[in-house]
Amino acid sequence: MKALAKLERAPGLTLTRVKRPEVGHNDVLIKIRRTAICGTDIHIWKWDDWAQKTIPVPMHVGHEYVGEIVEMGQEVRGFAIGDRVSGEGHITCGFCRNCRAGRRHLCRNTVGVGVNREGAFAEYLAIPAFNAFKIPPEISDDLASIFDPFGNATHTALSFNLVGEDVLITGAGPIGIMAVAIAKHVGARNVVITDINDYRLELARKMGATRAVNVARESLRDVMADLRMTEGFDVGLEMSGVPSAFTSLLEAMNHGGKVALLGIPPAQTAIDWNQVIFKGLEIKGIYGREMFETWYKMVAMLQSGLDLSPIITHRFAADDYEKGFAAMLSGESGKVILDWTV
């Protein structure tokens, strides 16, 4: 089958032919329709330090997808041939303390599709049926293909009660931008997002941001004054992994505020702990999606009117993957979709 793979320990990916995956007793085989390019895939493309330490070579990658079940293992129940599915990209052990307690997103033995094992940038993907998630007919293939990052945004944004709250999001990548729409959809009052990329900030405005702030030109304190915020933000969502952004977020938080961290800062990042301790801040780390409560919430929000369509900005045939990666690398894109049906 056709697949997009890392064949050499060097930048780039290669469209190649690989063996169609075998289907285990508890697996489903998915014929891929659409995939989306993730920031993780950009790290793999660039072959940065993280990728060099993490990605097996050779291996085809990718983990954001939607497709149709075409084969099932003999032990699979609850699915049928022809079901349209996306899937949870974190494959968990099922036996550790957290898995047994229903907290599979905290499994200490997680294996990542397209990171630690063969991925979805291919004509077919085999995954455990437990990880497959049926997509309702009213949700498009394009939207279903971005459920993985949409889930990251949902898990992060809905970690705390947002109704009537003032929310600060640092980092206007696709996940941060989707978090804007989620926060507004569930009843936040002011949703402010910061970045230095004007293209992405404009996307955030289209998704409903109260203010989208280029911090290279505008003061967050001035924006807060314009919004008549006298006490600080109630909820902070750090999506960038940039130390200066995290610092500014902590400074802007109200006493008793709650902070969710999805962005990954450098390991030795220093912060002013006075901001955390004396403000009584609650900080929560976010990894992946809650299985499968996050997935149900994603579907429910889309069915109740959440509009994510502006975040999908580019579409290419899978054979034109280089154009898709170029769009992502340019910094002037939202989500980029690759079509495996043409």
UniProtKB/Swiss-Prot annotation:
Pathway where it operates: Amino-acid degradation; L-threonine degradation via oxydo-reductase pathway; glycine from L-threonine: step 1/2
Source taxon at top rank: Bacteria
Keywords: Cytoplasm, Metal-binding, NAD, Oxidoreductase, Zinc
GO cellular component, as recorded: cytoplasm
Amino-acid positions noted as binding Zn(2+) 1 in the UniProt annotation, renumbered to this chain: 38, 63-64
Subcellular compartments: Cytoplasm
Any GO MF annotation of the entry: zinc ion binding
Site (described: Important for catalytic activity for the proton relay mechanism but does not participate directly in the coordination of zinc atom): 148
Cofactor binding, note field: Binds 2 Zn(2+) ions per subunit.
Binding sites annotated in the UniProt record for NAD(+): 175, 195, 200, 262-264, 286-287
Matches recorded under SMART domains: PKS_ER
Cofactor dependency: Zn(2+)
Biological process (GO), any one: L-threonine catabolic process to glycine
EC class: oxidoreductase
Residues annotated to bind Zn(2+) 2: 93, 96, 99, 107
Family per similarity comment: Belongs to the zinc-containing alcohol dehydrogenase family.
Subunit structure as annotated in this protein's UniProt entry: Homotetramer.
PANTHER family named in the record: L-THREONINE 3-DEHYDROGENASE
Name this polypeptide is given: L-threonine 3-dehydrogenase
Annotated organism of origin: Burkholderia multivorans (strain ATCC 17616 / 249)
Organism lineage string: Bacteria, Pseudomonadati, Pseudomonadota, Betaproteobacteria, Burkholderiales
Gene name linked to the record: tdh
